[in-house]
């Protein structure tokens, strides 16, 4: 019964990871077209999108266009644009000339007539329409959520991480390349409001509809682009942050206004904690928004979506089992954490998705640390270990749009918590986290870049450490035995050259003293004189075994 209750408690997170990553082991041409940097993608660099669409909730229909501005890197005449069935890419135009489109599943290859000269800046407009995929279980099995609120008004939102933004609009659907800016013009029926990323720069009123123009002036990843349509009301506040005044806006359903004004106080607390640990919020120019949606939530850039039903924890549950998880709204903290790790620092390939989810799950621990103390934070992150399965590596296969194990959440957080112990210097550790967000500001990255950066800053060879926790499923096991006043110890169940230092707590029962002792195990037996009994510091994510 205890195992059943634990499974039911952790099911949402397990479902989240399985929905986005799945269990697929065989890959198709479509997977490669979607997941690799094809020749038809690599020759041009994204500059800007202008997505101009009309959303018809009654018919669950979207139509419109995307003007794509780009810089030519290498001369070529075939451009890949992605749009998923059942949507139809109907036309492509450059310099008033309609272009031929070769359709290959969800990839569409546009034959360009104009000579594409390296260094030149060009534009192409693609047109599309249709009934986009309806989200089955958003946000994990995403698409468009076509819902109604309690008053019978349309309540519509997009979610597409993993699945891809091309599920609802045409784009260069690979994470390695981001536009430097984006304009979203979204036409919706009269009486409804659309909220998207960035700042509202214009509203056009028509007799039966309204067009909302939202602009982002920072780089944005495709899945971070969103539409949220409903009977929204707005309230706002100013956060005095590290880069000055940050506009924080909240869009909620009209009947939830008073409830939200109280509950959303977690947003300011989140900014305080994360600016302390990670550095300035990365998108001051675009503001910060929390937007109510009919699904649980997602890290859409500067337009974080929220559907946790105004409860503390994860829909009222504490994923750590410690009680600390009920001190805050999980969705506000977790999804806002992604503004630093997902939207500021973005993986180039979804195989490295732990860079998003591991660091952001770890951010929950840092929120607790900032507001409730280091001991509480340790209890929280250690409590999340019960959700770790260790069945598949965290790093997934490359170039096929496939993530790794769902362990990237809790195991990712615990490997970072373990690294904090190894660093043994909280000022240094905080500087590393802030340095990541400064040195990789608005960049797409590989896990190798992140691993190398941390290794360099810690002045350690951490390759075996990352190989152990990211690319292996075994938990390091510290074998030890106490013989004649000595502790003998070694690592077992580890990759070659794994040599992580670890702290043990030594209690001298004669003198009544307790102190922390750092040892440096390898895969060969080593020994050290001690006096008293020992306890392994449980802040390290390892197993231990007394072999006597």
Describe the role of every protein-language-model region.
Residues 17-63, 95, 147-155, 463-464:
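N-terminal, polar/Ser/Thr-rich
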Residues 20, 84-147, 209, 526-529:
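A surface-exposed beta-strand-loop module
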Residues 24, 28-30, 40, 127-236, ...:
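Extended, low-hydrophobicity, Ser/Thr/Pro/Gly-biased non-transmembrane segments
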Residues 64, 172-333:
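Hydrophobic helix-coil surface modules that form long, contiguous segments used
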Residues 88-94, 462-463, 478, 482-539:
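Beta-strand-rich binding/interaction modules
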Residues 160-161, 268, 273, 284, ...:
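Zinc-dependent metallopeptidase catalytic helix centered on the HExxH motif
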Residues 217, 353, 357-418, 440:
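Acidic/His/Gly-enriched intrinsically disordered linker/tail segments
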Residues 282, 405-487:
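Amphipathic alpha-helical substructures
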